[in-house]
Amino acid sequence: DLLESRGLGDVYKRQFFCWLEENAYALINGNVELRIEAIKRSCQIKARIVENDELEHGDRALLNLGHTFCHALEAVTNYSDILLHGEGVSIGCNLAFDVSARLGLCSQEVPSRVRNHYKSINIATDISQINGFVGNTERIYDLMAQDKKVVNGVIRFILASDIGKAMVQENVSKDLIIEVLQDSLER
């Protein structure tokens, strides 16, 4: 899936993200050869990560960039067709980069670049773009606190210091997450 490919580019390979940026127009307009190449590359990246970390103790967790946000958004929309999984991952990746910048893990240019790339190919970047969305930030946060990545009551976020450089971050304040969610609702 092309949206999952973009997520892999965000989290694991800056070179792949740059390739996706360069080929965005052709990919979105159906260039079959490039789509096959994008999916092939993303599968190779994912397979390499899973092979090296079968039990998700290291780099494999980084494949979940955006997924903590995504799973909560899917739940709050009752897993309906108003939010496809790939769209949720896209919005979640953008939220993760926003949190990363606010924590000072990356410069503000990084989430701006990711958001601009997604927008250039008409992929959702914010909660406000979910048609018919009815929810609030507290409910989204509560659902995030139930995610499988919660350990001993602490949400483990996959955040980024740059495109292609992700890390696990714990103890991110609820207030910061609520603020980022609210901004995404209002954008």
Q: Which positions does each model-derived feature cover?
A:
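C-terminal charged capping/lid subdomain of soluble metabolic enzymes
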Residues: 105-187
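Single conserved hydrophobic/aromatic residue that forms the stacking wall/gate
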Residues: 1-12
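Short, flexible active-site loop motifs that bind/organize anionic cofactors or intermediates
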Residues: 1, 101, 167
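Internal alpha/beta core interface subdomains
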Residues: 13-17
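A structure-centric signal for secondary-structure junctions around beta-strands
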Residues: 8, 59, 152-154
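Active-site segments that bind and position negatively charged phosphate/pyrophosphate groups
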Residues: 22-138
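Acidic/polar active-site rim loop that often engages polyanionic ligands
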Residues: 6, 19-23
